[in-house]
Regions:
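Alpha-helical bundle regulatory/interaction domains
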Residues: 2-39, 43, 91-235
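Conserved short histidine dyad/triad with adjacent acidic residue
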Residues: 11-16, 41-54, 58-75
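Conserved hydrophobic/aromatic beta-strand scaffold that supports enzyme active sites
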Residues: 52, 60-62, 82, 105-107, ...
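Glycine- and acidic-residue-biased ligand/ion/polar-headgroup-sensing regions
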Residues: 56-58, 65-95, 131
Length: 235
């Protein structure tokens, strides 16, 4: 296990090689606060491997689970999580279960999830983002306030190339080379977050997708505006 050990910046990255779920949770609490403290302990030993990072307003991860893990979900300030499974199954318990598996991606609103299970040697790439970050970015891109909550399509076919860009950014962020970039740039965590937000808004279907794809309004040349004003004044 290693963490980002830079002394000049807040630590936000965990690298684990088959750390026990208890040890992973303890390290998480030390680095990010007691978000998951008080959760029931696993009934059987579970090992967690991979990389987990959390920066203001979101997280990214590439994790694998050796053993089945069922855990409750804490209140995560209206975060939306996106899962790209590569092995096993992940089961989110809401009013009904939603199951992610290789080829099937999920977008889940964590506030509506009661518990989540990682089953059958589950592994995935994933990220979580606060809804407010999506709303802020959409307002900037569309040039107007966002009046409705952004809602993402809950289940997608990962066979579509559109989703590979998101996964590639997560893979880059959880790769060994990225740690060098983190240590060399204090702005990198924020830039990474911007890349993830933009790639999700661009690729994962949501209720503002159509608005984003509309061509931006163009300013007509002055002579065109004058002609239009004349026509309006002299019908």
């Amino acid at each position: 296990m290693t963490v980002d050990t830079s002394t000049s910046r807040k630590q936000f990255l965990i690298r684990s090689e088959n750390m026990s779920a208890d040890d992973f949770g303890e390290l998480y609490t030390r680095m990010f606060g007691n978000l998951y403290s008080g959760m029931p302990r696993p009934e059987r030993p579970v090992a967690i491997g991979g990389v987990y990072g959390r920066h203001e307003g979101g997280s990214f991860r590439r994790l694998s689970f050796r053993g089945d893990l069922l855990t409750e979900m804490p209140d995560l300030d209206d975060e939306i999580t996106f899962i790209f499974p590569s092995a096993g199954r992940v089961v989110f318990n809401q009013s009904s279960d939603r199951v992610g598996m290789p080829g099937v991606g999920l977008a889940m609103e964590k506030a509506q999830v009661r518990s989540v299970g990682f089953i059958d040697g589950h592994a995935h790439h994933g990220l979580s983002v606060r809804r407010a970050l999506f709303a802020r970015r959409l307002a900037m891109l569309l040039g107007r306030p966002i009046t409705h909550k952004v809602r993402f399509q809950p289940r997608v076919d990962l066979g579509s190339e559109a989703f590979q860009g998101i996964k590639a950014i997560v893979a880059m962020a959880t790769g060994n080379e990225f740690e060098m970039l983190i240590r060399s740039s204090a702005l990198m965590p924020e830039r990474l977050q911007e890349m993830l937000v933009d790639s999700v808004l661009d690729s994962w279907p949501h209720n503002y997708s159509e608005a984003l794809r509309r061509p931006a309004p163009q300013i007509a040349p002055r002579h065109v505006r004058l002609a239009m004003e004349y026509i309006q004044q002299h019908p």
